[in-house]
């Protein structure tokens, strides 16, 4: 007698995440895993969900999140589930929920994570996640800035041999606790003062344990080519798998340089460097407000300000005019603060997106009072604007970029694909209507066209379970990890 299924999603078009053509099939789920795919019209099941001709796909994997502390503070994560995200990689740009800095040490970039205290080490961070249970799955990186702040008395200096060993030991402990790798934020301090020996030392620790290095590179403007090459060289010297975070070329003088940076990435891959990259599908970036940039970019919008919260959502130029000062002075008065910088070319973003090893990472900042719309709309924007409207890729190829590709790059076993035995992370969406609705002026509007989202077999959208959060902590399986030609 056939064992009963818990749920059958029937009447949909299945896209398995691996890039192949969609097919008409039912998906059967038992417990937390997919138990059957095919014609399940006669299969016994406790529940049936009529997909009504919609797309049934693997849940999306957000490769670049800053939700590190949100799993404890606001575990509902509606900004993720409402756009079909079932897993996220946190700890990016060199900052993470652990380890906590030594007393007296701090860094401006930590404000991106919010005001909650950090955890002493990654083991304690993961313990808190296990106790709280996230709504979606979480893979975590440990931040290089955190390592510096926790190991060095003067994080603005070069590490002593003892401090370098301490950072490497902390990294090894974090990887042992479950981190999938480490991240650098070389455009921020204190990571920006790190030199080759320091980065190579950490990358060797990661490589020896099958982990990876993701990097917010040192410069995304005039020196973007050199900054890309710097990180590729770390991977080449150490054998550490590498991800270039939110790759972009900022400022009009640098638009078009992605042709060179992508060519350099391809040459590195051909030479044996395991490298991938990600983008968010918008022509504006967002991070902390940096006064030194205020007179370099014409269009800057404030997302939050501690001394002037009333300025959230307003243009820096308008604020400066109202205050009767220049933009740099206004920015200094607003800090600590966050901002959106409109300095990217949409056509270039689209070119980068089409690279075969490019994934999608929202880079969303959930603590911002007036966030960048990428927080709520990145994945549905790809489906609606890049696929349906612009026809940059087939729907199947775009889904692969958001599912199987990141699962391979980050070594997330049995994720990112619809197959018997895989974890039941599933999104059901209408290919004809799916799109982002979040805008620069209304950045927290939920997406259109996402109809059902399941995490490990449990429905989390449109209605989250009242008392159960089904997410898991994801560890890296080095045996399946790597950008496509490096996967085993």
Curated annotation (Swiss-Prot):
<keyword id="KW-0963">Cytoplasm</keyword>
<dbReference type="InterPro" id="IPR011059">
    <property type="entry name" value="Metal-dep_hydrolase_composite"/>
</dbReference>
<dbReference type="GO" id="GO:0047421">
    <property type="term" value="F:N-acyl-D-glutamate deacylase activity"/>
</dbReference>
<dbReference type="InterPro" id="IPR013108">
    <property type="entry name" value="Amidohydro_3"/>
</dbReference>
<dbReference type="GO" id="GO:0005737">
    <property type="term" value="C:cytoplasm"/>
</dbReference>
<keyword id="KW-0862">Zinc</keyword>
<dbReference type="Pfam" id="PF07969">
    <property type="entry name" value="Amidohydro_3"/>
</dbReference>
<dbReference type="InterPro" id="IPR050378">
    <property type="entry name" value="Metallo-dep_Hydrolases_sf"/>
</dbReference>
<dbReference type="InterPro" id="IPR023100">
    <property type="entry name" value="D-aminoacylase_insert_dom_sf"/>
</dbReference>
<keyword id="KW-0378">Hydrolase</keyword>
<protein>
    <recommendedName>
        <fullName>N-acyl-D-glutamate deacylase</fullName>
        <ecNumber>3.5.1.82</ecNumber>
    </recommendedName>
</protein>
<dbReference type="InterPro" id="IPR032466">
    <property type="entry name" value="Metal_Hydrolase"/>
</dbReference>
<comment type="similarity">
    <text>Belongs to the metallo-dependent hydrolases superfamily. N-acyl-D-amino-acid deacylase family.</text>
</comment>
